Amino acid sequence: MKKLLVLVFALGLFGTAHAQFGIRAGYSSANFSDFDSKAIGGFHVGGFYKIGAGFIAVEPGIQYSQKGHIRTGDTGTPAVDQDRLNYIDVPVLLRVNFLPFLNVFAGPQGSVLVSRKLEYADGSTDTSTEAIKGYEIAGVVGVGVDLPLGFNAQASYDLGIQSTNYYNQDVKNNVLKLSVGYTF
């Protein structure tokens, strides 16, 4: 994955004069698929490199992203614990511009688990990552709007393709992201 990212950035630097750097941050709402839990709020922040102009562009990026879930009690009691999983995401998106300001995008995303904080209802915490696979693959889809003065906004959904093997259960991270950014 690291070599692929370096190659994409290198091709972009030397292959086109229509390339732009940018930064992006926003709110994330994450949950596990096929798991009895509630969504957990978090944030994401990172950068991207948009290669291309006009109708189509490739956009590799890198971002810090909070994922995870809130486990609830068996009888509908308040939240039992919050499990926050922190990842470095590396998406490679294909953007298609339908109007000068409106685009849709999709592509693969590799993620590496960098830390975890499991907060139990009794106040104790666990930071061990042994019960979770250290990487995952997802598909990303979304829609973006280019605003005046280089600003942009987007809504995206990360759909986990590969199981996180969470305590030997077949669950995947699913994340809704609302972002604002700036393109230099």
Please identify what each model-predicted range represents.
Residues 31-37, 66-86, 114-135, 163-176:
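Flexible, solvent-exposed loop segments that connect beta-strands
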Residues 144-151, 172-184:
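Outer-membrane beta-barrel "beta-signal"
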Residues 20-28:
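Cleaved targeting-peptide boundary
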Residues 27-31, 51-55, 64-68, 110-114, ...:
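Transmembrane beta-strands of outer-membrane beta-barrel pores
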Residues 17, 51-55, 96-100, 147-149, ...:
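Outer-membrane beta-barrel strand-turn architecture
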Residues 41-47, 88-92, 137-143, 174-178:
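Hydrophobic, lipid-facing positions within transmembrane beta-strands of outer-membrane proteins
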